UniProtKB/Swiss-Prot annotation:
GO terms for molecular function: 1-deoxy-D-xylulose-5-phosphate reductoisomerase activity; manganese ion binding; NADPH binding. Its cofactor is Mg(2+); Mn(2+). It comes from Macrococcus caseolyticus (strain JCSC5402). Pfam families: DXP_redisom_C (PF08436), DXP_reductoisom (PF02670), DXPR_C (PF13288). NADPH binds at S10, G11, S12, V13, G36, K37, N38, N118, E120, G199. This is 1-deoxy-D-xylulose 5-phosphate reductoisomerase. NCBIfam families: Dxr, PRK12464.1. HAMAP family: DXP_reductoisom. It catalyses: 2-C-methyl-D-erythritol 4-phosphate + NADP(+) = 1-deoxy-D-xylulose 5-phosphate + NADPH + H(+). InterPro entries: DXP_reductoisomerase, DXP_reductoisomerase_C, DXP_reductoisomerase_N, DXPR_C, DXPR_C_sf, NAD(P)-bd_dom_sf. Keywords: Isoprene biosynthesis, Manganese, Metal-binding, NADP, Oxidoreductase.
Length: 376
């Protein structure tokens, strides 16, 4: 039996993590979890899974947890307690935003393996996180379908034989639209992703291609690859999740249906694989797989992400923080879709980069840029 903790149990990845635990009751047990303000779901999780400890967002919410048999904690300190809970064998960090960074560090320092779905952890502090993981002999297993694919392709391979990583991208909600047409798209249009079921923020990031940019930065740290050896490729079916090309010109790809439960299960079960009852990939039904070179003029946020990691230091922190704020401003109807990339680029150009920042500097800059509201 493997004991699982989940940060962000009420989110898209978190609820799918619960599905996996539900499907394998003799293999996995939920022992700790956090939710934001979704107290109704928290009570259902407690009733079904009987965990030991739960974290809610605010102190006043503690009394709304109906079970007396569970320890209830709250806020950022509560997240830290969940992350390092002594019974955790693995922590699924699916909390959104840089608030997930400190709990990741805390879990690593307590020797707990990480199933990582929180992009910001590696985007803003990848070098620090991977160094800590090596120091504490902790496995970081990616849950993003693209990074899980690369991780699987690299099983048993020698790192020095890698020629390049190829990360696929669906193109998001607006892949069929011209750039001119993007000026007038609505929030409702943006939230209709053609392939994946995801939260609002990541769906917008997929439409701008910032999501793919964040994944490029994650891959740079997860797989210790120079940025010029990480490519992106448009693949609208989301069947090939990513590929690795080796120095002998061979290419290994990982394929599957667009279902996040697959990489979650792989992270939970690694280095084993568990049989799973789910829709299986039928390539005859798919019929064809389409590929297209990435257009950096069309997807400027992806270019900004390449620029940010090439510059390094605190630049990815600024890019990520501003993106988080302006995506919310777009969702709130305050700015247009193309304003997202314009504002991010402007703020990046104005930033004085600090190289080799420590964790506190990263968090200070992150908070500084997230405290602002951005005008067009």
């Amino acid at each position: 039996m493997k004991n699982i903790g989940i940060l962000g149990a009420s989110g898209s990845v978190g609820t799918q993590g619960l599905d996996i635990i539900r499907q394998y009751p003799d293999t996995y047990k939920l022992v700790s979890f956090s939710v934001g303000k979704n107290l109704e779901l928290a009570n259902k999780i407690i009733e079904e899974f009987r965990p030991d400890i739960c974290c809610v967002q605010d102190k006043e919410d503690i009394d709304k947890i109906q079970s007396s048999s569970i320890k209830v904690v709250y806020g950022n300190d509560g997240l830290m307690e969940i992350a390092a809970y002594v019974k955790n064998d693995m922590l699924l960090n699916s909390i959104m935003g840089s608030i997930g960074l400190k709990p990741t560090v805390h879990a690593i320092k307590h020797g707990i393996d990480i199933a990582l779905a929180n992009k910001e952890t590696l985007v803003v502090a990848g070098e620090i996180i991977m160094q800590l993981a090596r120091e504490y002999n902790v496995n970081i297993i990616p849950v993003d379908s693209e990074h899980s694919a690369i991780f699987q392709c690299l099983n048993g391979e020698d790192h020095k034989h890698i020629e390049k990583l190829i990360i696929t991208a669906s193109g998001g909600s607006f892949r069929e639209l011209s750039r001119e047409a993007l000026k007038d798209v609505t929030v409702q249009d943006a939230l209709k992703h053609p392939n994946w079921s995801m939260g609002k923020k990541i769906t917008i990031d997929s439409a701008t291609m910032m999501n793919k940019g964040l994944e490029v930065i994650e891959a740079r740290w997860l797989f210790d690859m120079p940025i010029d050896k990480i490519e992106t490729l448009l693949h609208k079916q989301s069947i090939i999740h990513s590929m690795v090309e080796f120095n002998d010109t061979s290419v290994i790809a990982q394929l599957g249906t667009p279902d996040m439960r697959m990489p979650i299960l792989y992270a939970f079960s690694y280095p084993d694989r568990l049989a799973r009852k789910a829709e299986r990939l039928n390539l005859a039904e798919v019929g064809q797989l389409d590929f297209k070179a990435m257009d950096f003029d069309r997807y400027r946020c992806l270019k900004l992400a390449y620029d940010a990691i090439s510059i390094g230091g605190t630049m990815p922190v600024v890019m990520n923080a501003v993106n988080e704020v302006v995506v919310q401003q777009f969702l709130d109807g305050e700015i247009g879709f193309l304003d997202i990339e314009t504002i991010i680029e402007r703020e990046m150009n104005a930033h004085d980069v600090i190289q080799s920042p420590d964790l506190e500097t990263i968090l200070e800059i992150d908070a500084q840029y997230k405290s602002r509201k951005y005008e067009v």
